[in-house]
């Protein structure tokens, strides 16, 4: 969403609003807003390099040069080794992060073709569908994300549930957004 399209990111906002109107109080529908912990700083560099090699081979040597060895970070008299994530300020950072996330997003779409919406803007995801499917997507992300350095920040994920007639399968620390606002 939003790449090379003026106002492209807003399309997901409008889609969410429209789906919320359409589903109204349907107890079988739910929306999950996904949040990853420290997303850009935690992506697995081995996975990132593999994705660059596969998808953007012309950039591979440069990205490998920049990310195949730990970067030295100076903190006072201490030198820290940065071994994960993309470097702050790297103009390729959003692209590299997206390359790591993309296979997970494709897996979600393949395994859950009946989702009403599955949209990502960098590390922000919005998933709308049946309670059962969205819960299974949540579990898939928890299971498959860490191998890519994508760890759900469960306390910052949000659920919007128009009507809670169904049992709630999500962990208690996932935030429930009040339907009133």
Language model: regions and residue ranges:
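Short glycine-rich loop/turn motifs that provide flexible caps or phosphate-binding loops at active sites
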Residues: 1, 7, 84, 88, ...
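Charged boundary/loop elements
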Residues: 1-32
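Short, glycine/acidic-rich hinge or "gate" loops at secondary-structure transitions
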Residues: 1-6, 116-118, 154
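Residues in well-ordered beta-strands of folded domains
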Residues: 2-4, 74, 160, 173
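Low-complexity, intrinsically disordered short peptide segments enriched in small/polar/basic residues
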Residues: 10, 105, 116, 131, ...
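Hydrophobic helix-cap positions at the C-terminus of alpha-helices
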Residues: 19-23, 108, 144
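Conserved polymerase palm-domain catalytic core
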Residues: 25-139, 148-150, 159-162
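Short, conserved micro-motifs composed of acidic
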Residues: 143, 153-181
């Amino acid at each position: 969403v939003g790449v090379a399209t003026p106002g492209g990111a807003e399309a997901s906002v409008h889609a969410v609003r429209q789906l919320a109107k359409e589903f109204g109080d349907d107890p079988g529908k739910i929306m999950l807003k996904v949040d990853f912990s420290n997303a850009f700083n935690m992506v697995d560099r081995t996975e990132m390099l593999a994705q660059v090699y596969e998808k953007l081979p012309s950039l591979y040597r440069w990205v490998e040069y920049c990310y195949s060895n730990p970067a030295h970070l100076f903190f006072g008299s201490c030198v820290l080794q940065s071994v994960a994530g993309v470097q702050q300020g790297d103009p390729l950072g959003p692209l590299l992060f997206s390359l790591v996330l993309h296979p997970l997003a494709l897996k979600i779409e393949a395994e859950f073709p009946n989702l009403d919406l599955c949209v990502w803007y960098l590390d922000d995801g919005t998933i709308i569908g049946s309670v059962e499917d969205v819960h299974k997507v949540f579990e898939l992300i928890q299971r498959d994300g860490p191998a890519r350095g994508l760890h759900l920040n469960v306390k910052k994920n949000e659920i919007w549930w128009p009507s809670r007639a169904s049992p709630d399968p999500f962990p208690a620390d996932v935030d429930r957004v009040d339907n009133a606002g």
